[in-house]
């Protein structure tokens, strides 16, 4: 019998980088804080593994898989929850669809996978001129929440392209919808570096875990003129015989590091009623009760900071 090959890089990425169960709680709380009700429809742009979409639907089930909070704790939307996962790569979406079917069973139909440019996918009532490709955009629902996580907003390099995306996202939202993205910055974001972290996967969602592995995040180069960052992800996976299988350049990114003022200003210019920066902060004197998620007016000069940016329609 042939030896099994190394795990799919998408699987390793899912375990090393993403925390979808936490993300769907965060997205729900943001919406509830801003709109005083629970969201039902999530759209995940640049979806990749579509982990947030799967977790969104899983959390709505009373028998949610282990690792996902049941909707009763976070949501009154319950069985009304559905998700739309948009990505341009067919192989990645096929992997994500198989994972959704495995984890969600008959509820997998509540996640719709759409292959295409995020700028070509819109509700029918939001469609203006034909997309340059000539293809009619698929009919999709307006979203309560559009998520652009894993720093995917940095794929846009030019101001006019980012502005066009924000305008499009606003049109794709329901009347009280919000756009949520995350960003990072600080001196550490511009420094050449390699960060290593050991990952010991423990199944929490009913899916088999890959072998233990090392996750390596490399910031290979930074261009101060264009504010562009060359990033790579590598993996070194444990083998049964004690060796390792190395997957170099499993993922590569050419990102423009947008600043928080640029992002909030462009959101407002795109027609959003408000644009806010949110962070997790912690008051050590309050212990577990000291964790706070909410808007901030200032971020101190940290070596590397992380933040959410919310466009409020």
Task: List where the protein language model places each region.
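A short glycine-rich, Lys/Arg-flanked "PGG" loop and its adjoining helix->strand segment in the class I
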Residues: 162-175
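SAM-dependent methyltransferase
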Residues: 181-265
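Conserved SAM-binding loop
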Residues: 96-97
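Conserved SAM-binding strand-loop segment of SAM-dependent methyltransferases
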Residues: 104-124, 128-131
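A short acidic, Gly/Pro-enriched loop at the edge of an enzyme's catalytic core
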Residues: 124-146
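Conserved class I S-adenosyl-L-methionine
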Residues: 38-48
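Conserved SAM-binding loop of SAM-dependent methyltransferases across substrates and taxa
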Residues: 49-79
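C-terminal lobe and adjacent flexible extensions of AdoMet/dcAdoMet transferase-like proteins
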Residues: 251-313
């Amino acid at each position: 019998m042939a030896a099994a090959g190394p795990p799919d890089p998408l699987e390793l990425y899912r375990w090393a980088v993403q925390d979808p169960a936490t993300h769907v709680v965060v997205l729900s709380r943001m919406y509830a804080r801003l709109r005083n009700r629970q969201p039902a429809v999530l759209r995940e742009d640049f979806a990749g593994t579509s982990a947030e979409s799967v977790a969104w639907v899983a959390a709505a089930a009373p028998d949610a898989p282990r690792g996902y909070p049941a909707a009763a704790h976070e949501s009154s939307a319950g069985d009304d929850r559905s998700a739309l996962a948009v990505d341009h790569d067919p192989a990645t979406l096929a992997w994500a669809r198989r994972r959704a079917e495995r984890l969600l069973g008959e509820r997998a139909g509540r996640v719709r996978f759409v292959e295409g440019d995020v700028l070509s996918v819109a509700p029918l009532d939001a469609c203006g001129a034909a997309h340059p490709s000539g293809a009619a955009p698929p009919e999709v629902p307006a979203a309560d929440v559009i998520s652009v996580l894993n720093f995917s907003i940095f794929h846009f390099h030019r101001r006019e392209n980012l502005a066009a995306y924000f305008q499009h996202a606003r049109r794709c939202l329901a009347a009280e919808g919000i756009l949520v993205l995350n960003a990072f910055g600080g001196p550490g974001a511009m420094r050449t570096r390699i960060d290593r972290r050991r990952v010991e996967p423990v199944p929490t969602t009913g899916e088999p875990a890959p072998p233990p592995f090392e996750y390596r995040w490399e910031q290979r180069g930074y261009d101060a003129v264009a504010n562009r960052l060359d990033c790579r992800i590598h993996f070194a996976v444990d083998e049964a015989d004690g060796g390792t299988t190395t997957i170099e350049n499993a993922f590569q990114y050419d990102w423009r590091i947008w600043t928080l003022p640029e992002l909030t200003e462009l959101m407002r210019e795109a027609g959003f009623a408000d644009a806010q920066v949110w962070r997790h902060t912690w008051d050590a004197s309050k212990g577990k009760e000291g964790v706070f998620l909410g808007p901030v007016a200032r971020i101190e000069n940290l070596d590397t900071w992380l933040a959410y940016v919310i466009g409020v329609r």
